[in-house]
């Protein structure tokens, strides 16, 4: 079977993700032209290219931020239609964006932001987390990731580096199938990146 690649456009058995012929255009520019990408489960994969090559655009298609793409997305051997962030989340896809200020809710605490996805998923269900339980789970996730921030601290009180780490913790807390990281450690120091 060889590497985690494509064989004549067919889905390789065991692939977690397959993006086929993904194209997207914005007024005056074709951002992606029949892009292809595949990933195996349990492995880290990287998109490498020059600025403006379409790496972030491809990741945003997967996250549901760009609904007007053409092409196919396959997840665990099944075709999926991802046209919104809710579609991505329903399919077990999480993304950590470069833009931390738009991804976190500043009026909420660190713990509330870390557990936000799970809390929203459980809205209307009897499994609503009690606030004490939420903070305990958030504290455990932060500790496991060596993030030294109190879960009760407000996000608006954090440094940019701390915000980035909280955003990564939130993505990890969901136990998703596919975690997309768009330069997640760009705002962090070498030491902070190594600790994460």
Model-identified regions with their sequence ranges:
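Glycine-rich phosphate-binding loops of nucleotide-dependent enzymes
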Residues: 9, 13-196
């Amino acid at each position: 079977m060889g590497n985690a690649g494509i064989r004549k456009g067919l889905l390789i058995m065991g692939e977690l993700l397959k993006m086929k012929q993904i194209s997207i255009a914005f007024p005056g520019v074709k951002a992606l032209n029949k892009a292809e990408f595949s990933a195996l489960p349990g492995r880290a994969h990287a998109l490498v290219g020059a600025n403006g090559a379409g790496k972030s655009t491809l990741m945003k298609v997967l996250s549901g931020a760009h609904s007007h793409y053409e092409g196919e997305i396959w997840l665990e051997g099944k075709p999926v239609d991802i046209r919104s962030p809710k579609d991505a989340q329903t399919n077990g896809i999480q993304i950590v964006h470069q833009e931390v200020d738009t991804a976190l809710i500043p009026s909420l605490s660190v713990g509330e932001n870390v557990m936000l996805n799970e809390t929203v998923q459980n809205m209307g269900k009897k499994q609503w987390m009690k606030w004490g339980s939420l903070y305990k789970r958030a504290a455990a996730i932060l500790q496991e990731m060596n993030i030294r921030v109190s879960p009760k601290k407000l996000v608006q009180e954090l440094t940019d580096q701390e915000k980035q780490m909280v955003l990564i913790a939130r993505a990890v807390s969901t136990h998703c199938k596919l975690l997309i990281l768009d330069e997640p450690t760009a705002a962090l120091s070498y030491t902070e990146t190594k600790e994460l």
